Swiss-Prot record:
Gene that produces this protein: hemL
InterPro entries: 4pyrrol_synth_GluAld_NH2Trfase, Aminotrans_3, Aminotrans_3_PPA_site, PyrdxlP-dep_Trfase, PyrdxlP-dep_Trfase_major, PyrdxlP-dep_Trfase_small
Pathway in which this enzyme or protein is active: Porphyrin-containing compound metabolism; protoporphyrin-IX biosynthesis; 5-aminolevulinate from L-glutamyl-tRNA(Glu): step 2/2
GO cellular component: cytoplasm
BP terms from Gene Ontology: protoporphyrinogen IX biosynthetic process
Primary localization class, coarse: cytoplasm
Catalyzed reaction equations: (S)-4-amino-5-oxopentanoate = 5-aminolevulinate
Cofactor(s) this protein requires: pyridoxal 5'-phosphate
Organism: Limosilactobacillus reuteri (strain DSM 20016)
Modification type N6-(pyridoxal phosphate)lysine: residues: 270
Name this polypeptide is given: Glutamate-1-semialdehyde 2,1-aminomutase
SUPFAM superfamilies tied to this protein: PLP-dependent transferases
Matching Pfam families: Aminotran_3
Gene3D superfamilies with a match to the protein in the record: Aspartate Aminotransferase, domain 1, Type I PLP-dependent aspartate aminotransferase-like (Major domain)
Length: 431
């Protein structure tokens, strides 16, 4: 195995574990899925990150998706500098909130009204409460391997960190909450029809990642997503597209524009904060007007819509154009095709997926359509190759259940270097 000096990161991690559970504030950062200690990052610029040992990496994690303009984008940083000089938070309305709401509405017209929050978890949790209050029903439908944050109702059969650690749900989630969460395999059209035939009049909503991003990148099929739209309409349930990850990532106008399906509600996050803590949920006006203070379904948040997160979102989205997504898609296509070609040269079983700026690779040559397919992939090979990639200056997600991303700052040269790093990793792993 190639050598990488991470002495300072190892010391920092040992110290962190004295004061924080597992030494981190989000479990996937701990590198447990790849059998080693995490890198501690000093700074980032454009498509690169630099650890505290001085190692430089081409970054495809990008803070788990938000940094579509790369690290420390000059315009975003300049706008944040101006905003923070005025004050970090007021607990009162600001012009930035309305400005970002208008930008989101223009790009994603299905979001007629929006409520800003501080995380993706808060966005999905609040959207579920709104759906239950609006329909006067309790049960919700989610899909195995889809991750919608860590609120209790949505931790059943989830992806992301739960998948990384092999956990089905979490201790502390009451059985009665799990009872009201109905689960179906992702992309299982027959399963969806059967579930709604049996429970349709009890279901408040179905929440789905239209492109799953928390078990690697797995697109929802057109038939699957259209079936969801049809059965929710038939039974008076709401359809929620969780685009916290895929929004402004899979496509400029969201996955809903790719599949030509309009959900009742959409959840957002990540990119719309430009790297600051943020989330949002929105949709049809007649539904959203039930949120307090316009209606009686409660939501509040001390830092919801805070001026720094709003500025981060505005200064990010105002720079992006549909043409940027065409260019990024070309680069991801070249990258994933190059990785697959390198894998084939060494007889490494591999399937690659990408949608827009999101991409992932699976150490399995069989079709990957759901969570069970992902779990059948070669974890040991993933682990070996991960460390080889790091040693060659490429930072990818430290779990086969997570998504990688690209930014506007990644260059053709970065793509070539990354493919070469994968080639070297496959060579080392197959010796």
């Amino acid at each position: 195995m190639s050598k990488l000096d991470t002495t300072k990161s190892k010391i920092a991690f040992k110290e962190a574990q004295k004061y924080m559970p597992g030494g981190v504030n989000s479990p996937v950062r701990a590198f447990k899925n790849v059998g080693g200690d995490p890198l501690f990052i000093d700074h980032g610029k454009d498509e690169y990150i630099y650890d505290i040992d001085g190692n430089k990496y081409i970054d495809y994690v990008l803070s788990w998706g938000p940094l579509i303009l790369g690290h420390a984008d000059d315009h975003v940083v300049a706008e944040l500098d101006k905003a923070v000089a005025k004050g970090t938070s007021y607990g009162a309305p600001t012009l930035q909130e309305t400005e970002l709401a208008k930008i989101v509405n223009k790009i994603m017209p299905s979001i007629e009204m929006i409520r800003m929050v501080s995380s993706g978890t808060e966005a999905t949790m609040s959207a579920i409460r709104l759906a239950r209050g609006y329909t006067h029903r309790k049960k919700i439908v989610k899909f195995v391997g889809n991750y919608h944050g860590h609120s209790d109702s949505l931790l059943v059969d989830a992806g992301s960190g739960l998948a990384t650690f092999g956990i089905n749900t979490s201790p502390g989630v009451p059985d009665d909450l799990a009872y009201d969460t109905l689960t179906v395999a992702y992309n299982d059209v027959a399963g969806v029809k059967k579930l709604f035939a049996e429970h349709g009049d009890e279901i408040a909503c179905a929440i789905v990642e239209p492109v799953a991003g928390n078990m690697g990148v797995i697109p929802g099929t057109q038939e699957f997503l259209q079936t969801l739209r049809n059965v929710t309409n038939e039974h008076g349930a709401l359809l929620i597209f969780d685009e916290v990850m895929s929004g402004f990532r899979a496509a400029y106008h969201g996955v809903q524009s790719l599949v030509n399906i309009t959900p009742d509600l959409t959840t957002l996050g990540k990119v719309i904060g430009g790297g600051l803590p943020v989330g949002a949920f929105g949709g049809r006006r007649e539904i959203m007007e039930n949120i307090t203070p316009a209606g009686d379904i409660y939501h509040a948040g001390t830092l919801s819509g805070n001026p720094l997160a709003m500025t981060g979102g505005i200064s990010t989205l105002e720079q992006l154009t549909p043409d940027d997504y065409v260019e990024m898609d070309k680069k991801v296509t070249a990258l994933t095709e190059g990785i697959k070609h390198a894998a084939d040269q060494y007889g490494v079983p591999m399937t690659v997926h990408h949608v827009g700026t999101m991409w992932s690779y699976f150490y399995n040559s069989d079709p990957i359509n759901n969570f069970d397919d992902v779990k059948a992939c070669d974890q040991k090979l993933f682990e070996k190759c991960f460390w080889e990639l790091l040693a060659h200056g490429v930072y990818v997600a430290p779990s086969q259940f997570e998504t990688n991303f690209i930014s506007t700052k990644h260059t053709d040269e970065d793509i070539e270097k990354t493919i070469a790093a994968f080639d070297a990793a496959f060579n080392a792993a197959t010796k």
